[in-house]
A protein has these predicted regions:
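Low-complexity, charge- and small-residue-enriched intrinsically disordered regions
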Residues: 226-228
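Phosphate/oxyanion-binding active-site loops and adjacent basic polyanion-contact surfaces
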Residues: 18-22
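S-adenosylmethionine/decaboxylated-SAM
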Residues: 2-13, 23-194, 207-224
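Alpha-helical and His/Cys-centered functional microenvironments
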Residues: 197
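Residues immediately within or flanking Cys/His clusters that coordinate Zn2+
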Residues: 202
Length: 228
C-alpha cells in the first residue's frame, strides 16, 4: 500500500489550499517525529493538512496529533471558524484518522498555558495576520524540543512571510531547511552560536558555519496586516 498516495486521496476531498507536494512533506515530517514527541497544528480549518499529519504519524512512531482551532473566531478568507468544526470532525472521521487527533477548541495562547507538550513538529496554518501568527508562535515556542521542526503554511501572504523573516530566518534559534510551494520548513537550532560579524553586518558562526545578516529588521507588524 502506498500510504502517501492514500493520504493524498483522502485529503483531496477536503476544502483547502494545500498542494500535493506540501501535503507529502507534512506527511514525511510527521512520520519522522521521534517516539514520545507530539505534533501540534494551529488553525487547520477543515482538516486537510491534519489528515496528512495524522497519517504520517500513524506510519511513523504513532505521535499524538493536537489540532488547535479556536471556535467562533473570524478568519480573513476562511469565514467563521465555528462553522468549520463539524466539517473538520466529519472529514477526519471519513479519512479514518479521527481517533488519532485531539481537537482543542481554544486559542493557541490559552492552549499553550494549559499543559506542557513535548512538541517535535509545530505546524502553523491559516494565518494572514502577522500579529496573530507571532502571538501563537511565541506561546508555543517554549514547548519545542531540541531539533524540533516548524512548518509555516501560506507564506505567499504578507503576515506569514514577514513572520518567517523575523522569527525564523533572522533568528539565532532556527535554520530554514526547505521551501515547498508556499510552505517554509525550519529546524530548531541547538548550536550555541559564536558569531563573527564583518563590516557589512553579515555574520558567520564559528561553530556550525551558519550565515545571517545582523542589519536592523524593519517593523513588519503594521505593514503585514493585509489578508488574502
Amino acid at each position: 500500500v502506498d500510504y502517501v498516495e492514500a493520504a493524498g486521496q483522502l485529503a483531496s476531498d477536503i476544502d483547502g489550499w494545500l498542494s500535493d507536494r506540501e501535503g507529502e512533506v507534512l506527511y514525511e515530517l510527521a512520520k519522522a517525529v521521534p517516539p514520545g514527541q507530539t505534533i501540534v497544528e494551529i488553525r487547520s480549518w477543515r482538516g486537510e493538512s491534519t489528515v496528512w499529519l495524522a497519517m504520517g504519524a500513524s506510519a511513523g512512531n504513532g505521535s499524538s496529533v493536537y489540532s488547535l482551532d479556536p471556535q467562533g473566531e473570524q478568519g480573513p478568507g476562511v469565514g467563521d471558524l465555528k462553522e468549520t468544526y463539524p466539517a473538520m470532525v466529519k472529514n477526519l472521521s471519513n479519512a479514518g484518522v479521527r481517533d488519532g487527533v485531539t481537537i482543542l477548541s481554544s486559542s493557541a495562547e490559552v492552549a499553550a498555558l494549559r499543559r506542557r507538550r513535548n512538541v517535535g513538529l509545530l505546524c502553523m496554518g491559516v494565518f494572514q495576520d502577522y500579529d496573530a501568527i507571532r502571538s501563537a508562535f511565541v506561546a508555543w515556542k517554549p514547548h519545542l524540543l531540541a531539533a524540533a521542526v516548524v512548518a509555516v503554511k501560506d507564506c505567499d501572504q504578507p503576515g506569514p512571510s514577514c513572520f518567517v523573516e523575523e522569527y525564523l530566518r533572522q533568528s539565532d534559534d532556527f535554520s530554514i531547511v526547505r521551501t515547498i510551494d508556499t510552505t517554509i520548513i525550519a529546524a530548531y537550532d541547538s548550536c550555541v552560536h559564536y558569531w563573527v560579524i564583518d563590516s557589512v553586518d553579515s555574520g558567520v558562526c564559528q561553530h556550525c558555519g551558519r550565515r545571517r545578516t545582523f542589519r536592523a529588521l524593519p517593523r513588519w507588524g503594521k505593514a503585514a496586516g493585509a489578508g488574502k
